[in-house]
Regions:
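Conserved ABC ATPase signature
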Residues: 139-143, 147-149
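Short coil-to-helix segment of the ABC ATPase nucleotide-binding domain corresponding to the Q-loop/switch region
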Residues: 99-107
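Helix-to-loop junction immediately C-terminal to a conserved catalytic motif
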Residues: 53
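Conserved ABC transporter NBD signature motif
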Residues: 61-69
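A short, proline-enriched helix->beta-strand linker immediately N-terminal to the Walker B motif
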Residues: 158-162
Length: 246
Protein backbone atom coordinates (compact mmCIF):
# COMPACT_ATOMS: atom_id res chain seq x y z
CA UNK A 1 0.00 0.00 0.00
CA UNK A 2 1.28 3.46 -0.91
CA UNK A 3 1.35 6.09 1.82
CA UNK A 4 2.51 8.91 -0.45
CA UNK A 5 2.16 9.47 -4.19
CA UNK A 6 3.27 12.43 -6.28
CA UNK A 7 2.32 12.45 -9.96
CA UNK A 8 3.99 15.04 -12.22
CA UNK A 9 4.02 17.66 -9.47
CA UNK A 10 5.35 21.13 -10.22
CA UNK A 11 5.54 24.02 -7.77
CA UNK A 12 6.18 27.47 -9.21
CA UNK A 13 6.51 30.50 -6.95
CA UNK A 14 7.53 34.13 -7.23
CA UNK A 15 5.82 37.06 -8.92
CA UNK A 16 8.28 38.98 -11.08
CA UNK A 17 10.86 36.20 -11.32
CA UNK A 18 9.26 32.77 -11.23
CA UNK A 19 11.12 29.80 -9.77
CA UNK A 20 10.31 26.12 -10.21
CA UNK A 21 10.70 24.61 -6.77
CA UNK A 22 9.55 21.25 -8.12
CA UNK A 23 9.63 20.35 -11.79
CA UNK A 24 7.28 17.57 -12.93
CA UNK A 25 8.30 15.35 -10.00
CA UNK A 26 6.82 11.89 -9.54
CA UNK A 27 7.55 9.50 -6.68
CA UNK A 28 5.86 6.94 -4.46
CA UNK A 29 6.57 5.63 -0.96
CA UNK A 30 5.07 2.57 0.69
CA UNK A 31 3.39 2.38 4.07
CA UNK A 32 6.00 1.71 6.72
CA UNK A 33 8.88 2.87 4.54
CA UNK A 34 11.62 5.15 5.87
CA UNK A 35 12.64 7.48 3.03
CA UNK A 36 15.33 10.15 3.13
CA UNK A 37 15.43 13.08 0.71
CA UNK A 38 18.81 14.53 -0.25
CA UNK A 39 20.07 17.11 -2.72
CA UNK A 40 22.03 20.35 -3.05
CA UNK A 41 20.89 23.58 -1.44
CA UNK A 42 18.00 24.95 -3.49
CA UNK A 43 17.25 21.57 -5.06
CA UNK A 44 13.64 21.56 -3.85
CA UNK A 45 13.87 19.43 -0.69
CA UNK A 46 11.99 21.82 1.58
CA UNK A 47 9.58 22.70 -1.22
CA UNK A 48 8.78 19.00 -1.53
CA UNK A 49 8.11 18.68 2.20
CA UNK A 50 5.89 21.77 2.20
CA UNK A 51 3.95 20.51 -0.81
CA UNK A 52 3.36 17.11 0.82
CA UNK A 53 2.18 18.92 3.97
CA UNK A 54 -0.31 20.99 1.98
CA UNK A 55 1.44 24.19 3.06
CA UNK A 56 2.67 25.06 -0.42
CA UNK A 57 0.10 24.33 -3.14
CA UNK A 58 1.17 22.40 -6.21
CA UNK A 59 0.95 24.43 -9.42
CA UNK A 60 0.21 21.25 -11.34
CA UNK A 61 0.13 17.51 -10.74
CA UNK A 62 -1.41 15.38 -8.01
CA UNK A 63 -0.40 14.59 -4.42
CA UNK A 64 -1.99 11.83 -2.34
CA UNK A 65 -1.26 11.04 1.30
CA UNK A 66 -2.80 7.90 2.82
CA UNK A 67 -5.10 7.67 -0.18
CA UNK A 68 -6.34 11.24 0.14
CA UNK A 69 -5.79 13.86 -2.54
CA UNK A 70 -4.47 16.99 -0.83
CA UNK A 71 -4.18 19.28 -3.83
CA UNK A 72 -7.18 21.58 -3.97
CA UNK A 73 -7.93 21.49 -0.23
CA UNK A 74 -9.14 24.72 1.34
CA UNK A 75 -6.93 26.28 4.01
CA UNK A 76 -9.21 24.92 6.73
CA UNK A 77 -9.27 21.43 5.20
CA UNK A 78 -5.48 21.45 4.79
CA UNK A 79 -5.01 22.46 8.43
CA UNK A 80 -7.30 19.66 9.60
CA UNK A 81 -5.46 17.20 7.34
CA UNK A 82 -2.13 18.19 8.89
CA UNK A 83 -3.48 17.83 12.43
CA UNK A 84 -4.93 14.38 11.78
CA UNK A 85 -2.64 12.68 9.27
CA UNK A 86 0.82 14.23 9.63
CA UNK A 87 3.50 14.55 12.27
CA UNK A 88 6.28 17.14 12.02
CA UNK A 89 9.82 17.24 13.40
CA UNK A 90 11.97 20.28 12.70
CA UNK A 91 15.59 21.30 13.14
CA UNK A 92 14.61 24.02 15.63
CA UNK A 93 12.46 21.68 17.83
CA UNK A 94 9.57 24.24 17.90
CA UNK A 95 8.59 23.42 21.48
CA UNK A 96 6.48 25.78 23.60
CA UNK A 97 8.77 27.13 26.32
CA UNK A 98 5.92 28.13 28.63
CA UNK A 99 4.79 24.49 28.85
CA UNK A 100 6.55 21.55 30.45
CA UNK A 101 7.66 18.48 28.52
CA UNK A 102 4.47 16.49 29.11
CA UNK A 103 2.23 19.39 28.13
CA UNK A 104 4.20 19.86 24.91
CA UNK A 105 3.86 16.20 23.98
CA UNK A 106 0.08 16.01 24.46
CA UNK A 107 -0.72 19.19 22.50
CA UNK A 108 -1.91 17.30 19.36
CA UNK A 109 -4.29 15.23 21.49
CA UNK A 110 -5.67 18.37 23.11
CA UNK A 111 -6.47 19.76 19.66
CA UNK A 112 -8.28 16.47 18.93
CA UNK A 113 -10.20 16.77 22.24
CA UNK A 114 -8.99 13.36 23.40
CA UNK A 115 -9.77 12.25 26.93
CA UNK A 116 -7.30 12.65 29.79
CA UNK A 117 -7.07 8.85 30.05
CA UNK A 118 -5.99 8.56 26.41
CA UNK A 119 -3.44 11.35 26.87
CA UNK A 120 -1.98 9.73 29.99
CA UNK A 121 -1.78 6.28 28.41
CA UNK A 122 -0.08 7.45 25.24
CA UNK A 123 2.36 9.90 26.81
CA UNK A 124 3.43 7.33 29.40
CA UNK A 125 4.09 4.67 26.76
CA UNK A 126 5.92 7.05 24.43
CA UNK A 127 8.01 8.58 27.19
CA UNK A 128 9.15 5.15 28.31
CA UNK A 129 10.06 4.14 24.77
CA UNK A 130 11.96 7.37 24.12
CA UNK A 131 13.72 7.43 27.48
CA UNK A 132 12.23 10.73 28.62
CA UNK A 133 9.98 9.63 31.50
CA UNK A 134 12.23 11.33 34.05
CA UNK A 135 11.90 14.76 32.43
CA UNK A 136 8.14 14.95 31.82
CA UNK A 137 7.67 17.63 34.49
CA UNK A 138 10.64 19.75 33.42
CA UNK A 139 10.45 22.93 31.36
CA UNK A 140 11.92 22.58 27.89
CA UNK A 141 14.51 25.22 28.80
CA UNK A 142 15.88 22.83 31.43
CA UNK A 143 16.69 19.92 29.10
CA UNK A 144 19.41 19.23 26.52
CA UNK A 145 19.14 19.56 22.75
CA UNK A 146 18.98 15.80 22.29
CA UNK A 147 16.21 15.56 24.88
CA UNK A 148 14.32 18.40 23.21
CA UNK A 149 14.36 16.57 19.90
CA UNK A 150 13.08 13.40 21.58
CA UNK A 151 10.25 15.45 23.06
CA UNK A 152 9.53 16.91 19.61
CA UNK A 153 9.42 13.40 18.14
CA UNK A 154 7.04 12.23 20.87
CA UNK A 155 4.75 15.18 20.15
CA UNK A 156 4.90 14.42 16.42
CA UNK A 157 3.75 10.80 16.76
CA UNK A 158 1.44 10.81 19.80
CA UNK A 159 -1.66 11.28 17.62
CA UNK A 160 -0.60 8.28 15.47
CA UNK A 161 -0.14 10.07 12.13
CA UNK A 162 -0.15 8.32 8.78
CA UNK A 163 3.14 10.00 7.82
CA UNK A 164 5.95 11.64 9.77
CA UNK A 165 7.72 14.53 8.03
CA UNK A 166 11.15 15.53 9.34
CA UNK A 167 13.16 18.52 8.10
CA UNK A 168 16.88 18.34 9.04
CA UNK A 169 16.04 16.88 12.49
CA UNK A 170 19.72 16.49 13.45
CA UNK A 171 20.85 19.88 12.13
CA UNK A 172 21.28 21.42 15.60
CA UNK A 173 22.72 18.34 17.31
CA UNK A 174 26.24 17.05 17.86
CA UNK A 175 27.25 13.67 16.44
CA UNK A 176 26.40 11.71 19.61
CA UNK A 177 22.92 13.18 19.94
CA UNK A 178 22.37 12.89 16.18
CA UNK A 179 23.00 9.14 16.30
CA UNK A 180 20.72 8.73 19.31
CA UNK A 181 17.90 10.70 17.67
CA UNK A 182 18.22 8.78 14.41
CA UNK A 183 18.10 5.52 16.37
CA UNK A 184 14.79 6.74 17.79
CA UNK A 185 13.45 7.35 14.28
CA UNK A 186 14.56 3.87 13.21
CA UNK A 187 12.96 2.22 16.24
CA UNK A 188 9.66 4.02 15.65
CA UNK A 189 9.77 3.00 12.01
CA UNK A 190 10.40 -0.65 12.83
CA UNK A 191 8.26 -1.06 15.95
CA UNK A 192 5.24 1.04 14.93
CA UNK A 193 5.56 0.56 11.16
CA UNK A 194 5.68 4.36 11.04
CA UNK A 195 6.10 5.89 7.58
CA UNK A 196 8.87 8.52 7.63
CA UNK A 197 9.80 11.12 5.01
CA UNK A 198 12.99 12.87 6.12
CA UNK A 199 15.00 15.68 4.53
CA UNK A 200 18.71 15.78 5.34
CA UNK A 201 22.04 16.91 3.91
CA UNK A 202 23.99 14.54 6.15
CA UNK A 203 25.13 11.15 4.81
CA UNK A 204 25.26 9.54 8.27
CA UNK A 205 21.69 10.59 9.01
CA UNK A 206 20.53 9.23 5.66
CA UNK A 207 22.01 5.76 6.34
CA UNK A 208 19.18 5.05 8.79
CA UNK A 209 16.64 5.13 5.96
CA UNK A 210 15.44 2.26 3.75
CA UNK A 211 15.73 4.35 0.61
CA UNK A 212 17.16 7.69 -0.44
CA UNK A 213 15.64 9.89 -3.12
CA UNK A 214 18.02 12.48 -4.54
CA UNK A 215 16.54 15.56 -6.18
CA UNK A 216 18.23 18.32 -8.13
CA UNK A 217 16.62 21.38 -9.69
CA UNK A 218 13.25 20.10 -8.53
CA UNK A 219 13.59 16.82 -10.42
CA UNK A 220 14.29 13.22 -9.45
CA UNK A 221 18.04 12.73 -9.91
CA UNK A 222 18.66 9.26 -8.48
CA UNK A 223 17.55 6.83 -5.80
CA UNK A 224 19.28 4.06 -3.88
CA UNK A 225 18.09 1.32 -1.52
CA UNK A 226 19.71 0.26 1.73
CA UNK A 227 19.87 -3.52 1.49
CA UNK A 228 22.04 -5.37 4.03
CA UNK A 229 25.36 -3.61 3.37
CA UNK A 230 25.42 -0.51 5.58
CA UNK A 231 28.95 0.52 4.60
CA UNK A 232 28.13 0.08 0.93
CA UNK A 233 24.96 2.13 1.41
CA UNK A 234 26.90 5.03 2.92
CA UNK A 235 29.50 4.89 0.16
CA UNK A 236 26.74 4.92 -2.47
CA UNK A 237 25.30 8.04 -0.82
CA UNK A 238 28.68 9.76 -0.95
CA UNK A 239 29.16 8.74 -4.59
CA UNK A 240 25.81 10.18 -5.67
CA UNK A 241 26.38 13.41 -3.73
CA UNK A 242 29.77 13.81 -5.43
CA UNK A 243 28.13 13.34 -8.83
CA UNK A 244 25.63 16.04 -7.87
CA UNK A 245 28.46 18.40 -6.98
CA UNK A 246 27.92 18.27 -3.23
Amino acid sequence: MSILQLENVSVIYGDNVQTKGLNNLSLETKAGEFVAIMGPSGSGKSTLLNAVAGILPATSGRIQVAGRAIDGLSDEEAAQFRREELGFVFQEFNLVETLNVKENIVLPLMFQHQSVDVMEERVTKLAEGLGISAILDKRVTEISGGQRQRVAIARAVIHQPALLLADEPTGNLDSKNSKEVMSVFKELNEQLNLSIFLVTHDAMTATYSDRIIFIKDGRLYNEIYRGDDELGYKQSIINVLEMMGE
